[in-house]
Amino acid sequence: MTGILAVQGAFAEHAAMLDHLGAPWKLLRAAEDFDDSIDRVILPGGESTTQGKLLRSTGLFEPIAEHIAAGKPVFGTCAGMILLARKLDNDDNVYFGALDAVVRRNAYGRQLGSFAATADFGSSSGDSAVVVAPGEHVPQDAPADIVLKDFPLVFIRGPFVAEVGPAATVETSVDGNVVGLRQGKILATAFHPELTDDTRIHELFLSL
């Protein structure tokens, strides 16, 4: 079952996406919500500083940190990417510190704070990659080499990755800025796939 952090931000949209896919989920609002049924976690978009404080005050920080440290699947979108990052290049706060990347908060500034784009999502080391076109579905046993063609990217005052460490793999970039990463069973995007009708990234997460 997917636990969706629900202390602040766009958690309802992730829940709706999982409903559409027929995948069970549970909202995480307090430490007691994080039980043995949770085998994957979504960290939604929102305000990362507020979420960081509420993670501590609700007692959810430790169980989620232990989940990530155990190598279990986690998906962070926008603020969720910030919470996962090893370091922020314009903020002294560090939260889970699990994603080998330096992330820049509010990287696009106010003028370009919200915009849409389209790009391929995924990485390929050769000709053997599985390519999933719009309208198609990600296989349940999706390989590491998988490319989601023409994925719609919705940004709302999003971050981008200022520096990618060796443990992380770039999944997508826009105008030269890295906005999607994968590291083992960690998936992180600066954009909001839950605000689109395209379920492929959530399907990829559920396959991890």
Swiss-Prot record:
This is Pyridoxal 5'-phosphate synthase subunit PdxT. It comes from the Bacteria. Catalyzes the hydrolysis of glutamine to glutamate and ammonia as part of the biosynthesis of pyridoxal 5'-phosphate. The resulting ammonia molecule is channeled to the active site of PdxS. PANTHER family: PYRIDOXAL 5'-PHOSPHATE SYNTHASE SUBUNIT SNO (PTHR31559), PYRIDOXAL 5'-PHOSPHATE SYNTHASE SUBUNIT SNO1-RELATED (PTHR31559:SF0). Pathway: Cofactor biosynthesis; pyridoxal 5'-phosphate biosynthesis. SUPFAM superfamilies: Class I glutamine amidotransferase-like. Pfam families: SNO. In the presence of PdxS, forms a dodecamer of heterodimers. Only shows activity in the heterodimer. GO terms for cellular component: cytosol; glutaminase complex. Belongs to the glutaminase PdxT/SNO family. L-glutamine binds at G46, E47, S48, R105, I156, R157. The active site is at C78 (nucleophile), H192 (charge relay system), E194 (charge relay system). GO terms for molecular function: glutaminase activity; pyridoxal 5'-phosphate synthase (glutamine hydrolysing) activity. GO terms for biological process: glutamine catabolic process; pyridoxal phosphate biosynthetic process; pyridoxine metabolic process. Its EC number is 4.3.3.6, 3.5.1.2. It catalyses: aldehydo-D-ribose 5-phosphate + D-glyceraldehyde 3-phosphate + L-glutamine = pyridoxal 5'-phosphate + L-glutamate + phosphate + 3 H2O + H(+); L-glutamine + H2O = L-glutamate + NH4(+). Keywords: Glutamine amidotransferase, Hydrolase, Lyase, Pyridoxal phosphate. The gene is pdxT. It comes from Bifidobacterium adolescentis (strain ATCC 15703 / DSM 20083 / NCTC 11814 / E194a).
